[in-house]
Amino acid sequence: KKIENGQIAITGKTDEGTLELEYADSIGTRKPVTIWNTVSHSASEHGSTFIKNILAARKFAYPKSVYAVHDSIRFVTKDKLNALIVDFFAGSGTTMHAVNLLNAEDGGHRRCIMVTNNEVSADEAKMLKDKGYQPGDAEWEKLGIAHYVTWPRTVCSIKGQDVNGNPLKGDYLGSEPPMHMADGF
């Protein structure tokens, strides 16, 4: 009854399907806890595996879970549907992916500016130098993080397909109604 009359708001859903509720007059005043022990925040399952499914053989060390970033951004922009998020270390593009997911869920128009360099890993740098390439050469730059991981992940998640053009498999967790990854954003 309190949900129906607006005293209590549904603010989310746990991995197990339990609704997260808050008194409407306290929304935006609650501080986050320092540890979120949530299955969907697993970097190996919803970071590394996610990247592998989108980017095939391309590698990125330690990507964050899209859901951990999504929940963090949602916490501070829940009532700011036109927020501008700036990610100064864009890495694998998780922040942009999370912003797009959040906008798709709540109809927001948040924007995300990604900033990153185009460095290559130490192993790739050695291999490229052994072949006579230097930073700035086309062969070097195409293996840099921005060109090889960040941008392709962003494009693939928006289009709903992997780097080979195949539809992404599965649904995004916690979305009601279910959002199919293959539908893109």
What are the roles of these predicted feature ranges?
Residues 4-8, 155-163:
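Non-catalytic alpha-helical coupling and interface elements of nucleotide-dependent molecular machines
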Residues 62, 66-160:
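Conserved S-adenosyl-L-methionine
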Residues 1-84, 106-109, 119-125:
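Class I S-adenosyl-L-methionine
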Residues 158-183:
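Short mixed-charge
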Residues 14, 110, 127, 165, ...:
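Residue-level detector of alpha-helical recognition elements and their boundaries
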Residues 31-33, 182-185:
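Sequence-level motif detector for i,i+2 pairs with an aromatic at +2
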